[in-house]
Curated annotation (Swiss-Prot):
<dbReference type="Pfam" id="PF00702">
    <property type="entry name" value="Hydrolase"/>
</dbReference>
<keyword id="KW-0472">Membrane</keyword>
<dbReference type="GO" id="GO:0008556">
    <property type="term" value="F:P-type potassium transmembrane transporter activity"/>
</dbReference>
<keyword id="KW-0630">Potassium</keyword>
<dbReference type="InterPro" id="IPR006391">
    <property type="entry name" value="P-type_ATPase_bsu_IA"/>
</dbReference>
<feature type="binding site">
    <location>
        <position position="345"/>
    </location>
    <ligand>
        <name>ATP</name>
    </ligand>
</feature>
<dbReference type="InterPro" id="IPR023298">
    <property type="entry name" value="ATPase_P-typ_TM_dom_sf"/>
</dbReference>
<keyword id="KW-0547">Nucleotide-binding</keyword>
<feature type="binding site">
    <location>
        <position position="513"/>
    </location>
    <ligand>
        <name>Mg(2+)</name>
    </ligand>
</feature>
<feature type="active site" description="4-aspartylphosphate intermediate">
    <location>
        <position position="304"/>
    </location>
</feature>
<feature type="transmembrane region" description="Helical">
    <location>
        <begin position="245"/>
        <end position="265"/>
    </location>
</feature>
<feature type="binding site">
    <location>
        <begin position="372"/>
        <end position="379"/>
    </location>
    <ligand>
        <name>ATP</name>
    </ligand>
</feature>
<keyword id="KW-0597">Phosphoprotein</keyword>
<feature type="transmembrane region" description="Helical">
    <location>
        <begin position="644"/>
        <end position="664"/>
    </location>
</feature>
<dbReference type="GO" id="GO:0005886">
    <property type="term" value="C:plasma membrane"/>
</dbReference>
<dbReference type="InterPro" id="IPR008250">
    <property type="entry name" value="ATPase_P-typ_transduc_dom_A_sf"/>
</dbReference>
<dbReference type="GO" id="GO:0005524">
    <property type="term" value="F:ATP binding"/>
</dbReference>
């Protein structure tokens, strides 16, 4: 969320430092087996400081042991700090959200119409409340009366107020948001503890953050490597005794810490938490870390045309009559079919009709209004004298044919002309007579071509689903740059599209906001629901966009890719580090007893004691150096998967081999004067 950037300050750093010490508790640290091994080594070193000869005679001074102890402690604190700082972001967000719902009261509307002030926690679903200008909405609900602007910045971070009114797509309100003009009467939809704000707090606080399958697999690998290195170190002791080489326990502890994958072990949790945080920064709530991670595996994106590829509010641009004598009749009929249509398209038709018609049009019409449905794909009104409908060409043509009406010869060409321009044609009929076509203009969002090109490079195929005919769909798909399209697609057809792609082994992501989208959102591997959407859609999805911007799916998928690549890059760096440190330290440790090892001491480290201290210091510092990468993620923009893989292998693989040699040598050049 944009409004929590103010929390990245000194206070957060201090809190993270405090948590770093709290996480030294073995009960906390055992969740990270690698760092737990480091802590065990630190405790053993502390015992050696107090009782130097407890494990046999040692030539190491107490000062040297204290140095090892301090470096091991700092290593653990650095690892704890990276995790605590990442967690601190979520806690800062949760605190800001709690402020939005603290000490709220509500103006409850009684059955007799009177008002009663109650505590917001006493509200029950189904009750009606009134909220005036300057008051905070106390609970989630639906506007049943009134029109007002609402400041949702406490939730979304967007400072511009939004208009809320009954009916249409913008009647849902969230508890904790502020009414900044007029008044609203709201039907309560949630009770205390179950509101959207409560769920947000639980999500961003991450109290129940479970490890994702990939994290578990990687942790298993790292734990196995740790055990292998422990076995290697343990076998060194009898070998050293056989060769009459004195290897103090403190040296073996330090060597163990240097060789096990402490770098990635110290950063792994922070990478996962930071990945979820980056999604939150885009005003998207992830219900689990797994949801963000699966985004990284997505290779097919199902995108709605309306609202995702186009701006969503198709605007009535022109009335096209079957002949010019029908123009006035077409305008009046289009107006009548839309007068009770609360959709943006319907309202734009009413506006255009008023602009074009010279005489005054009626404000109210007595009759039965038929709303648009995905099945009928038409809407209109039936009165005692007349029936007027507008709708999709196929639906209207079938309706007229069923009633033995005539189809004008030029109606199809009028529809084709509109479709070829990327618009949406709606045929208008009056008493089963076709009058003409309404041209609804679609406007494609800026910058989509470049973004789709970028996704294509990353190996992601884009599929546009639209209820438009094939000609309109093809025109828009070509202009927007999507890979494929599915025309005349109903909500239930999306499930088939998703299942077909999944049957081919693809990982599918999609967006949706309506109740009819809920099954498809649940079927998709990744479902992004709009905050302005229905409760069922938000429950079915595993991601919720607070800005209700469907194009966010593109950003979320890129963040998921970045999360996986960051984890892979830092794991590669850590393991390459271990290999380099092994060949850097072991020869220096053994060369005093085994002269042949001198030739392998390519770094010319001054002494075994200096080598160990230098490696330990490097081991601690590299965790701090990599925290920014763990938090921000590796760069993935504009590159293909193959290019990113090669770059990461060069930077983090080869770099992971070279950096330890250089770093340890530089530190050794300084340390040799003190050891």
């Amino acid at each position: 969320m944009h409004h929590v950037n103010k929390y990245f300050n000194q206070t957060m750093v201090i809190e993270a430092l405090k948590m770093s010490f709290y996480k030294l508790n073995p009960k906390q640290l055992i969740k990270n087996p690698i760092m737990f091994v480091v802590e065990v080594g630190m405790i053993l070193t502390l015992i050696l400081i107090c009782f130097p000869d407890i494990f046999g005679t040692s030539y190491l001074s107490r000062g040297y042991l204290i140095t090892i102890f301090i470096i091991l402690l700092i290593t653990i604190l650095f690892a704890n700090f990276s995790e605590a700082f990442a967690e601190g972001r979520g806690k800062a967000q949760a605190d800001s959200l709690r402020q939005a719902q603290s000490n709220l009261t509500a103006r409850l509307i009684e059955e007799n119409g009177a008002y009663r002030i109650v505590n917001a926690t006493e509200l029950k679903a189904g009750q009606n409340i009134r909220v005036e200008n300057g008051e905070t909405i106390p609970a989630d609900g639906v506007v049943i009366n009134g029109l007002a602007t609402v400041d949702e910045s406490a939730i979304t971070g967007e400072s511009a107020p939004v208009i809320k009114e009954s009916g249409g797509d913008f009647d849902g309100v969230i508890g904790g948001t502020l009414v900044t003009s007029d008044w609203l009467e709201i039907r309560v939809e949630s009770e205390a503890g179950t509101s959207f704000l409560d769920k947000m707090i639980a999500l961003v606080e991450g109290a129940e953050r479970n490890k994702t399958p990939n994290e578990i697999a990687l942790f298993t690998l790292l734990t196995t490597l740790t055990i292998i290195f422990l076995v290697v170190i343990v076998t060194l002791y009898p070998i050293a005794s056989y060769l009459h080489l004195i290897l103090p326990i403190a040296m073996l502890i330090a060597l163990t810490v240097c060789l096990i994958p402490t770098t990635i072990g110290g950063l792994l949790s922070a990478i996962g938490i930071a990945g979820m945080d980056r999604v939150t920064q885009f005003n998207v709530l992830a219900k689990s870390g797994r949801a963000v991670e699966v985004c990284g595996d997505v290779d097919v994106m199902i995108l709605d045309k309306t609202g995702t590829i186009t701006y969503g509010n198709r605007i009535a641009s022109e009335f096209l009559p079957v002949n010019q004598q029908m123009l006035e009749k077409l305008i009046v009929a289009a107006y009548m079919s839309s007068i009770y249509d609360d959709t943006p398209e319907g309202k734009s038709i009413v506006r255009l009709a008023k602009q074009m018609y010279i005489n005054e049009l009626p404000k109210d019409i007595d009759g039965t209004y038929k709303t648009f449905t995905a099945e009928t794909r038409m809407s209109g009104i039936i009165t005692n004298e007349i029936s007027v409908f507008k709708g999709a060409p196929n639906s209207m043509i079938n309706l007229v044919k069923q009633q033995q009406g005539n189809i004008p010869l030029n109606i199809e060409s009028l529809c084709m002309d509109v479709s070829s321009k990327g618009g949406t044609p709606l045929i208008v009929i009056e008493n089963n007579v076709m009058l003409g076509v309404i041209y609804l203009k679609d406007v494609i969002k800026d910058g989509l071509v470049e973004r789709f090109t970028e996704l294509r490079k990353m190996g992601i195929e884009t599929v546009m689903c639209t209820g438009d005919n094939a000609l309109t769909a093809a025109t828009i798909a070509k202009e927007a740059g999507v890979d494929r399209f599915v025309a005349e697609c109903k909500p239930e057809d999306k499930i088939k599209v998703i299942k077909d792609e999944q049957a081919k082994g693809h990982i599918v992501a999609m967006t949706g906001d309506g109740t009819n989208d809920a099954p498809a959102l649940a079927q998709a591997n990744i479902g992004l629901a709009m905050n302005s959407g229905t409760i069922s859609a938000k429950e079915a999805a595993n991601l919720i966009d607070l800005d209700s911007n469907p194009t966010k799916l593109i950003e979320v998928v890129k963040i998921g890719k970045q999360l996986l690549m960051t984890r892979g890059a830092l794991t590669t760096f850590s393991l390459a580090n271990d290999v380099a440190k092994y060949f850097a330290i072991l020869p220096a440790l053994m060369m005093s007893t085994i002269p042949e090892m001198t030739s392998l001491n390519i770094m010319h480290l001054s002494s075994p004691k200096s080598a160990i201290i230098s490696a330990l210091i490097f081991n601690a510092l590299i965790i701090v150096a990599l925290i920014p990468i763990a938090m921000k993620g590796v760069k993935v923009k504009g590159y293909s998967i193959d290019r990113i893989f090669i770059n990461n292998m060069l930077i983090y693989g080869l770099g992971g081999l070279i950096v330890p040699f250089l770093g340890i040598k530089l530190i050794d050049m300084i340390v040799q004067f003190f050891v």
